[in-house]
From Swiss-Prot:
Name listed for the protein in its UniProt record: Matrix protein 2
Species of provenance: Influenza A virus (strain A/Chicken/Pennsylvania/1370/1983 H5N2)
Main localization, broad class: virion
Activity regulation field: The M2 protein from most influenza A strains is inhibited by amantadine and rimantadine, resulting in viral uncoating incapacity. Emergence of amantadine-resistant variants is usually rapid.
Domain of life: Viruses
Record Gene3D superfamilies: 6.10.250.1640
Lineage summary: Viruses, Riboviria, Orthornavirae, Negarnaviricota, Polyploviricotina
Length: 97
């Protein structure tokens, strides 16, 4: 059985598509998967900055500040916030040494 079920033929009225076995479950499943793939790809292209920024930085809490003095913790928070405020278009990663 071939997955290529559509044949275009030239008629007097123009190009027509003659589909055979269009009720085949395999064809229906492949069509649904193809449509879902297209929708997900479009959403990915539209929202990739938001999605990847959220995955990369939103789910991480950053390095542990346990045992560090409160002044260093506050300084780290301010640096993180200023990096986000200054450059909202590009990803910014600040690592303290």
């Amino acid at each position: 059985m071939s997955l290529l079920t559509e044949v275009e033929t030239l008629t007097r009225n123009g190009w027509e598509c003659k589909c055979s076995d269009s009720s085949d479950p395999l064809i229906i499943a492949a069509s649904i998967i193809g449509i879902l793939h297209l929708i997900l790809w479009i959403f990915n292209r539209l929202f990739f900055k938001c999605i990847y920024r959220r995955l990369k930085y939103g789910l991480k809490r950053g390095p542990s500040t346990e045992g560090a003095p409160e002044s260093m913790r506050e300084e780290y928070r301010q640096e993180q916030q200023s990096a986000v405020d200054v450059d909202d278009v590009h990803f910014v990663n600040i690592e303290l040494e």
